[in-house]
């Protein structure tokens, strides 16, 4: 959440930055008008309370003064009305504020959509085939790796059931991801059923309510990303400054409606309602957030390098970043059959945006004051998509899949055929 005082006192700057994030200008104007009304109501309420306090002293001395008693009764009703008006305007102002995204860091390129993203680097050698490579969906079917029909029978479309060697390969990918980062990040195993407050704290609600699965007739949701659980481990807590930074990781199942995926690739294991990934999260002082982001994206890249998968790094523009992010890098892996890069990681610094919503602070060692921490999150990596990338990039002419060297220690086979 943005700091309402900064937004109010430096409106022109915030208006420019929020318009760069594709925020509707009408909503900004509505916030300013509601904020003015809220402060006016508060001022009138405070004056009425002061008057009531003075009047109460007079009534105490003149208990039989009917005029004073009538005036006191009338003032109490006025205070109640003013209090209701203040709360109403405060709630509207808060709701508007919760729908504003974070403002972009100064190093982020301005743009409306993904066409303005910047490609910063490419790593790895793309495979060269003397045959037409098959898409991972076809390889899954030919090699009996994923029982798409059985998953559809059990759950519906865009769910998958990995079989035998595919399940083992997925586990090997997961183990590699954890092992490469376990020396830096404390590992957690977390619940996937979460409450509404946790989703609000990280910025998934109210903005993306149509993309999360809500459990019917309950106050619970299925987690869309492990970022939610990891960030909320410290909701309403205060760190000692010397305990920062904190690095956490978790691997698990995530659930999304993918409401806006019409026209996007949904076949195979790329865009699923239920998917697996390893998540990285950091808590640090705000002035260190961008340097911590650079380190985090390198932590994600090392997995792609270990697997010898070609990839590129993108710096996302203002119009393509996630709601809570101030700066985001995407890592995209090469998909040999479709001849394109596909996202497997998104690493973001959120500044104090999430911490302000979740009330996560630290106590300054010098002055003893409490300040908001910065939070960072990154996927390292999407397990189902890495599975797809391995199939496409490590396939052979005779229909086999070669296992990347980095995964062989986790498996009792080195080819899938």
Curated annotation (Swiss-Prot):
Class of this enzyme: ligase
Keywords: Aminoacyl-tRNA synthetase, ATP-binding, Cytoplasm, Ligase, Nucleotide-binding, Protein biosynthesis
Known catalytic reactions: tRNA(Ser) + L-serine + ATP = L-seryl-tRNA(Ser) + AMP + diphosphate + H(+); tRNA(Sec) + L-serine + ATP = L-seryl-tRNA(Sec) + AMP + diphosphate + H(+)
MF annotations from Gene Ontology: ATP binding; serine-tRNA ligase activity
Domain of life: Bacteria
Gene3D superfamilies (UniProt xref): Bira Bifunctional Protein, Domain 2, Serine-tRNA synthetase, tRNA binding domain
UniProt GO BP: selenocysteine biosynthetic process; seryl-tRNA aminoacylation
Binding positions (L-serine): 225-227, 279, 379
Main location: cytoplasm
EC number: 6.1.1.11
Single GO cellular component term: cytoplasm
InterPro entries in UniProt: aa-tRNA-synt_IIb, aa-tRNA-synth_II, aa-tRNA-synth_II/BPL/LPL, Ser-tRNA-ligase_type_1, Ser-tRNA-synth_1_N, SerRS_1_N_sf, SerRS_core, tRNA-bd_arm
Biological pathway: Aminoacyl-tRNA biosynthesis; selenocysteinyl-tRNA(Sec) biosynthesis; L-seryl-tRNA(Sec) from L-serine and tRNA(Sec): step 1/1
Binding site for ATP: 256-258, 343-346
Cellular location(s): Cytoplasm
Quaternary structure annotation from Swiss-Prot or TrEMBL: Homodimer. The tRNA molecule binds across the dimer.
Free-text comment about domains: Consists of two distinct domains, a catalytic core and a N-terminal extension that is involved in tRNA binding.
Stated family: Belongs to the class-II aminoacyl-tRNA synthetase family. Type-1 seryl-tRNA synthetase subfamily.
Function per UniProt: Catalyzes the attachment of serine to tRNA(Ser). Is also able to aminoacylate tRNA(Sec) with serine, to form the misacylated tRNA L-seryl-tRNA(Sec), which will be further converted into selenocysteinyl-tRNA(Sec).
HAMAP family to which the protein is assigned, alphabetical: Ser_tRNA_synth_type1 (MF_00176)
UniProt name for this protein: Serine--tRNA ligase
Protein source organism: Mycoplasma genitalium (strain ATCC 33530 / DSM 19775 / NCTC 10195 / G37)
């Amino acid at each position: 959440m943005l700091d309402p005082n900064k937004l109010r006192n430096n409106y022109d700057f915030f208006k420019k930055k929020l318009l760069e994030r594709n925020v509707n200008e009408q909503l900004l104007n509505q916030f300013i008008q509601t904020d003015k009304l809220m402060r006016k109501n508060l001022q009138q309420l405070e004056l009425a309370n002061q008057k009531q306090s003075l009047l109460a002293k007079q009534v105490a001395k003149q208990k039989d003064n009917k005029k004073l008693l009538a005036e006191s009764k009338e003032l109490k009703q006025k205070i109640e009305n003013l209090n209701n008006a203040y709360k109403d305007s405060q709630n509207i102002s808060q709701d508007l504020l919760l729908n504003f995204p974070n403002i972009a860091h100064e190093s982020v390129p301005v743009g409306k959509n993904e066409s303005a993203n910047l490609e910063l680097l490419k790593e790895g050698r793309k495979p060269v085939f003397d045959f037409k490579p098959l898409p991972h969906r076809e390889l899954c079917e030919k090699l009996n790796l994923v029982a798409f029909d059985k998953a559809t029978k059990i759950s519906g479309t865009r769910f998958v059931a990995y079989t035998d060697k595919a399940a083992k390969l997925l586990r090997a990918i997961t183990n590699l991801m954890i092992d490469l980062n376990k020396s830096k990040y404390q590992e957690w195993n977390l619940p996937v059923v979460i409450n509404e407050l946790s989703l609000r704290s990280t910025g998934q609600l109210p903005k993306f309510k149509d993309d999360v699965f809500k459990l019917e007739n309950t106050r619970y949701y299925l987690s869309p990303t492990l970022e939610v659980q990891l960030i909320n481990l410290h909701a309403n807590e205060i760190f000692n400054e010397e305990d920062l930074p904190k690095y956490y990781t978790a691997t698990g199942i995530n659930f999304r409606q993918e409401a806006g995926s019409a026209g996007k690739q949904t076949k195979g294991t790329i865009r699923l309602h239920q998917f697996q990934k390893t998540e990285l999260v950091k808590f640090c002082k705000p002035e260190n957030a961008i340097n911590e982001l650079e380190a985090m994206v390198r932590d994600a890249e090392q997995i792609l390098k270990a697997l010898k998968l070609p990839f590129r790094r993108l710096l996302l523009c203002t119009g393509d970043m996630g709601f809570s992010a101030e700066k985001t890098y995407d890592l995209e892996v090469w998909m040999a059959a479709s001849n394109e890069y596909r996202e497997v990681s998104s690493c973001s610094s959120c500044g104090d945006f999430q911490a302000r919503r979740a009330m996560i602070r630290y106590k300054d060692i010098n002055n003893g004051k409490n300040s908001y921490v910065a939070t960072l999150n990154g996927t390292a990596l999407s397990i189902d998509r890495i599975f797809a990338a391995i199939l496409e990039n490590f396939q052979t002419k005779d229909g086999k899949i070669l296992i990347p060297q980095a995964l062989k220690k986790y498996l009792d086979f080195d080819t899938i055929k």
